[in-house]
Each structure stands twice: as C-alpha cells, then as structure tokens.
Amino acid sequence: MDSMSKSERVAFAMAELEARYPAPPIPLDHRDAYTLLVSVLLSAQCTDKRVNTVTPGLFELADNPRDMARQDVDEIRAIIRPCGLSPRKSAAILKLSQMLCDEHNEQVPCDFEALEALPGVGHKTASVVMSQAFDVPSFPVDTHIHRLMWRWGLSSGKNVEQTERDAKRLFPESRWNKLHLQIIYYARELSPARGWRIEEDVITLKIGRKAVIADARKIASRRA
C-alpha cells in the first residue's frame, strides 16, 4: 500500500474492476426471484458451478412455491445431495415454499425482514436476492469479498458484518449491486484464497496491505 489515500484506493479498485468486468453476469442460473432464492440457499458451502449442475433437475421437479410445497422432502433431498447439507437445505426449501404460499401469495417478498424470516434465509442470502432479483442496492459479503476487503486494507477483517458496513460506507450506493459481483469475479480469477499469484493481482499490489503482499511473496518464493 503506497501513499494513496483511502478514497484514492477505492477509486483505483473501482476503475480496475470496471475495466475488467464491465458487465459481470449473475453466477447462479435462475429464471426468477424464486429460483434465485433456492439457488442461493443451495450455494451455502457449495460452489456456484455445482449448484448450476443440480438446479436443472430440481426445477424440473418444481420451479415455483406451489409445486415445490407439494413435494416430498426426501425427493428434494436426493436431488440436491451433491450440494451438501442436503437434510437441512431440503427442509428449508420445502418450508420456505410453504411459507411463501401461506403468507406471501406465492411470491418472493422484496423486503429484507420478510426474506430473513424465511427458513434457511440469512442476511447474505436476502441481500443477494434483493440485489440480483429486485435491483435493490445491497452489498452481499461472501468469503471472497471479505478476503479482498481485508487484503486491500479497506476493512478490519473482523467479521462479515463489519466488512459489509465498510463496503457500504466506502463505495457509492449506485455501484453496490455491480461491485459485489465484480469483486467476486476478480477474487476468483486473480486473488483466490489458495494458489494466489500475487504478481498478477494488480489491485492488491497497488493498494493492498504491505504485510499481506510481503507474506504472499514469501509463500510464492517457497513454491518456486
């Protein structure tokens, strides 16, 4: 990290991300707010790639709350088993589908409080749905964003709640929905948790914590 101010570092990161990912696609395949909600729920401790291989079979069985609420939980569990945590996730999918039918006219609510009241839906899942399904300014923080905000010296890294507060404070609200996707793609490509090639990570090299860069170079030299 050089003598740049925090606002200059934020501006550099945003410009670099915009240049690399001008139109970042939503990683999870979906058709509407309901299929996105289910896909995000399945993505807990699972890769988006694997979720995208599982959801076609699940949505062939049922792709709306009414039809899903009529399914047997064991059948849902069998289909989603490759995503992991299938007992918990299948129960949540069935229960939230029933709740959408009973309390929300079979519609996914565009409301944080109502979303977080659904079984299996936490703040991050609700934020993804609000951002990607309803285009409501949100900043979902996953492990990738949490890691990069720390590496870039833009958050203390204490917890994801603090990282979200810092991201919302530092980045303009008009950019939140796009930025969180841009950071995820950058993290996966150039600043992963494992197999990190620091010399290719142009943003961290420019604005990152000096100690983080030094440690990464030491690890890279041992691998060489």
List the model feature ranges, each with a label.
Residues 2-223:
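Catalytic cores of DNA base-excision repair glycosylases
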